[in-house]
């Protein structure tokens, strides 16, 4: 998916992965009981923040990376029919190996 959103500073655009639809035992989880996803794919990355010395600090993730992020970090937005999340790179906790 190509996104025409360009995040500013150290922000990234993430498409959250779908939450589990069923439990391990096969029970269907209703939408109201689902946990917020904490894993997603990076769709766009900002240029990085500027530190106190005026140097640009690059972001540690790249487009296409799978990441785990803070449960309540970022701002949810709808764009082009998709639910996306714009969050600071500081809210990213880890990259998931492919």
From Swiss-Prot:
PROSITE patterns: CHAPERONINS_CPN10. Pfam families: Cpn10. SUPFAM superfamilies: GroES-like. This is Co-chaperonin GroES. One of its GO terms (cellular component) is cytoplasm. Keywords: Chaperone, Cytoplasm. One of its GO terms (molecular function) is ATP binding. InterPro entries: Chaperonin_GroES (IPR020818), Chaperonin_GroES_sf (IPR037124), Chaprnonin_Cpn10_CS (IPR018369), GroES-like_sf (IPR011032). The gene is groES. It is found in: Cytoplasm. Heptamer of 7 subunits arranged in a ring. Interacts with the chaperonin GroEL. Together with the chaperonin GroEL, plays an essential role in assisting protein folding. The GroEL-GroES system forms a nano-cage that allows encapsulation of the non-native substrate proteins and provides a physical environment optimized to promote and accelerate protein folding. GroES binds to the apical surface of the GroEL ring, thereby capping the opening of the GroEL channel. One of its GO terms (biological process) is chaperone cofactor-dependent protein refolding. Belongs to the GroES chaperonin family. The keyword Repeat does not apply.
